[in-house]
Amino acid sequence: GVIWDINRVGPSTGLPTRTQQGDLTMLYEASHGDTQHIVLIPGTVDECFEFGWRAFDVAEQFQTLVFGFSDLDLGMNRWATAGFEYPDQKLDRGKVIRTQEQLDAIENFGRYRDVDGDGIPYRTLPGSGLEPILYRGTGHDEDGIYSEDPGIYAATVARLKRKIEGARDLLPAPILREENDKQVGIIYYGSVENTITEIDDILESTTGLKVSTCRVRALPYLSLIHIRRSRRSIRS
């Protein structure tokens, strides 16, 4: 499933015509317990369209809820575009078993069994005539049977963690603008793209500071971000 959050100023009714970006951490860790979610963060109206269909693609591949996150500046105001780019290939439905032969090829099939080690189990579709689907909202084992066993619970949480971690490098990568002399770094997201570009120009023209920027476009971060941040002393 996909849920799109267009953030305005809160709390409660808040300021209904003002933009804000404070919902990001709420979406990333939504729900109770130890959990994470995939969040796509467009910064332009073109990316809003692209990330819209891409969110459904990712949700199918990883069998998980995906949040789209934009702010009121993008969601309510008028923006110009040269035209949206449509997907040039079919969306990936992920690990869907469509035939009895495919089902028989999996030893000891279970709806939540991690066959490939990536945290994403195989699934059948309702009405396919294959193995019936058993979904539970409570704790369950690999076969979907209710369980409160600590070991099974820990294994389930670890599997979900592997699934989200595996999405890192398939999500929209951050956009980096790097200076050779890395004096100042700005990490940002969302519709402040034009504002940050203006700040970059003002700082460099008035102070001579060289500004490098990184616009994050998805959570979890691209794995490369962790490597780059660990190698540099940068103020954010």
PLM segments and residue spans:
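Acidic/polar loop patches that form or flank catalytic/metal-binding clefts of enzymes
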Residues: 1-4, 13, 36-37, 63-69
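Flexible glycine/proline-rich, aromatic-decorated loop/lid segments
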Residues: 3-34
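Acidic, glycine-rich active-site loops and adjacent beta-strand->loop/helix elements
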Residues: 5-12, 44-46, 72-74, 217-220
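Peripheral docking tails and interdomain loops at the edges
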Residues: 31-32, 37, 46, 224, ...
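Active-site/ligand-binding-proximal alpha/beta "capping" segment
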Residues: 34-59
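Flexible, low-complexity linker and terminal segments
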Residues: 51, 56-224, 228, 236
